Amino acid sequence: MAMKRAIGLMSGTSLDGIDVALIESDGERIRLVKSANGLVAPLGPTGYRGYAEAERALLREATRDAEGLRARTDRPGRLAEAEDFVARAHAEAIEAFLAQNDLRPEDIDVVGFHGQTVIHRPKLGLTVQLGDGAALAKRLGIRVVSDMRANDVAQGGQGAPLVPVFHKALAEAAGFTGPLGILNIGGLANATLIDSGGNMLAFDTGPGNGPINDWMKERTGQDFDEGGATAARGTVDEDLLENLLGHPLILRAPPKSLDRNWFSHRLAGYLTVEDGAVTLTAFTAHAVARSLAFASERPARWIVGGGGAKNRTLMVMLERLLAAEVLNADAIGWSSDFLEAQAFAYLALRSLEGLPLTYPTTTGVAAPVTGGIVSEP
């Protein structure tokens, strides 16, 4: 199959903003260049559109309004307003990206549009990512693939994580072999484990940055714990940590996809700012470590992406608990900030080719299935 250009979009549950990334792929192979020192050159240009505080507030309110949803098409409260905003903001992000990189709509074969998750309840057969793919395609003049989780959930899968098939393809293109762990730490944390035979197991491990960010916002007004500096000054409350790690969703075996809102920062409410930050950080790290009970082989190397890769306190904890080499994705030429956006570009290309997005070992679906709704401009 011929290589195509795809743009991926990701707006995560941390509500920071919209990541934009361009890759070239045929839905299986990824165009990747290794430099003389063995690092991977960037897959393609990237961009970002941050959310203003009022925009974050709208998305937070829409997420609360979604708690009572029973049908995917219902839009009570501010959900309809938020859905219009999501499509508009993503269009603005791509338009700015194209202009900055001297690209035209006809240079792009497809856009992979994740949308904004407001509720994810696979046991109820319910997952909702706000964002009108048809409206986005019409405004941009580019084919759009959206709603990539729904088919997996309809077929009995967990609907998440979706990025493992991209992780595996990227690792293979970069020459990495198992046993390898690829960890993405956004609002939640999810792991892709590749054993020495190339077999893949993937699942959400537990909280990521979500509870830490919520804690910092509530207690300090800051959006996150920059570099893990606040946590570095604190002392872990071991009793609270053990209580948090007893959460039934942490103990549950894969397949496992989680909802960011299932892990609250408020259990740390009686602690100092520093002690709360470090205890919630330890919760994320220990949940990853305990997930290895489900692995056929312990990874000898971990590659960490997402916002959590910038939290030095968290990275030190992971290195100690995992007893393995732990690398920031940026250190090997990958992009810790844009891995998910790149993944949704890749998934959009797979969707166009009818290739599987999910597998029994990633979401628990009975057989590999494709997904996504294709909207023509």
Curated annotation (Swiss-Prot):
Keyword line: ATP-binding, Carbohydrate metabolism, Kinase, Nucleotide-binding, Transferase
BP GO terms, sorted: 1,6-anhydro-N-acetyl-beta-muramic acid catabolic process; amino sugar metabolic process; peptidoglycan turnover
Binding annotation for ATP: 12-19
Record-level Gene Ontology MF annotations: ATP binding; kinase activity; phosphotransferase activity, alcohol group as acceptor
EC number: 2.7.1.170
Pathway annotation from the record: Amino-sugar metabolism; 1,6-anhydro-N-acetylmuramate degradation; Cell wall biogenesis; peptidoglycan recycling
Catalytic activity: 1,6-anhydro-N-acetyl-beta-muramate + ATP + H2O = N-acetyl-D-muramate 6-phosphate + ADP + H(+)
PANTHER family, per the entry: ANHYDRO-N-ACETYLMURAMIC ACID KINASE
Family affiliation: Belongs to the anhydro-N-acetylmuramic acid kinase family.
HAMAP family: AnhMurNAc_kinase
Function: Catalyzes the specific phosphorylation of 1,6-anhydro-N-acetylmuramic acid (anhMurNAc) with the simultaneous cleavage of the 1,6-anhydro ring, generating MurNAc-6-P. Is required for the utilization of anhMurNAc either imported from the medium or derived from its own cell wall murein, and thus plays a role in cell wall recycling.
Entries under NCBIfam families matching the protein: PRK09585.1-5 (NF007141)
Protein name: Anhydro-N-acetylmuramic acid kinase
Gene that specifies this protein: anmK
